[in-house]
Amino acid sequence: VLAKTARGLLCIKQALPRLKVAQEWYAPVERNQAEVAWLRVATQIAPDCVPRVLGVDEQTKSFAMAYLDPAAYPVWKEQLRDGVIEPQTACMVAERLAAIHRATSGRPDLAEHFANDDTFYALRLESYFVATARAHPDVAAALHGLVKTTSANKHALVHGDVSPKNILAGPRGPVFLDAECAWYGDPAFDLAFCLNHLLLKCVWRP
């Protein structure tokens, strides 16, 4: 939600128990806390890669963050849709993700703080891989194996939703949004998730 205050505009985000998708899909509202925590870690590593967190309300499971004007921070997905293809944006997305993964690797403190296994499984592994395995039994064994491997790997802090719709092409490089699925696990997930979305965008712009 965009809020107007005496000091200017800001964004307020609240976690809802039911996600805004066509099918009935529920998720724990604690994912809001994971997002704030990820933003705070990421800004220490690459200060320009996330919006600034302005305040948190634990009771309502909401937080306020800096408003980034779309004129200066267009959504990367919309750029790709419109044929604005900047390879440098993709390079900087990879560089910033790598910096976050590298800086958070081998951190027992972060592993404990981001032990959001149940949320990550529900929002990412079950909803994508397990659901696909049910619909396509011929590849079920491979998908279940991938779920098992991904769940077992605990190497670095993972964003969990790195797609062009959650990335702003800012003047100082890409800005990551929507880290509700943040989890300490397999950083390969972030890379594969983003590459999958980029491959799908090729349908728009071969």
Predicted regions and their residues:
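Conserved protein kinase catalytic core
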Residues: 19-20, 72, 167, 184-186, ...
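Active-site acidic catalytic loop and adjacent metal/ATP-binding pocket
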Residues: 1-12, 144-191
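Active-site activation/catalytic loop segments of kinase-like enzymes and analogous catalytic loops
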Residues: 37, 188-206
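Active-site catalytic-loop/activation-segment of kinase and kinase-like phosphoryl-transfer enzymes
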Residues: 99-149
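Histidine-centered active-site/metal-ligand motif
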Residues: 97, 101, 159, 197
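ATP-binding pocket architecture of kinase catalytic cores
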Residues: 4-108
